[in-house]
């Protein structure tokens, strides 16, 4: 599916060849991303790791009660845990083709909604007030959540302190961040595409 986008600050248009978005692929890629981010530090102690006496708690016979050895057995409150969580990595690998496909589908989803904007130049010199003026002039001020994708350090410095923007480099662009932001504003240089 070809998507033609106007470039803000220029008369040119850019045509991107993007696939039709599929929820299953997007879900797969987001699940992969989030699993890599998991801390994986949940930990429990087994009966061998719980601190306590190793002595038999009462004689085997003659008490009329059930047979028990260790107070650290899982059956007791304060005892060890059986098959509890241990620190581990939840990361797994996803084919590169699927990752690329997911990224392109996320961009296509935003483009279909008219929420993907390419910009020729931000005309910002590192000051937040300049970026706010630029955003106001181009109708971006007041949007709920904006993902700003640019490699220009001055633009990143100007926009990073605003509560409604998330700023990232082109190399860090990912499916999860695209989908959790209402609007994506990107430097036209990051996307090649065909110019018209």
Residue ranges and their predicted role:
Residues 1-39, 84-196:
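Extended polybasic, low-complexity segments that bind anionic RNA or targeting/receptor surfaces
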Residues 41-47:
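Short coil/turn segments at secondary-structure boundaries
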Residues 47-83:
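Glycine/serine-rich anion-binding loops at beta->alpha junctions
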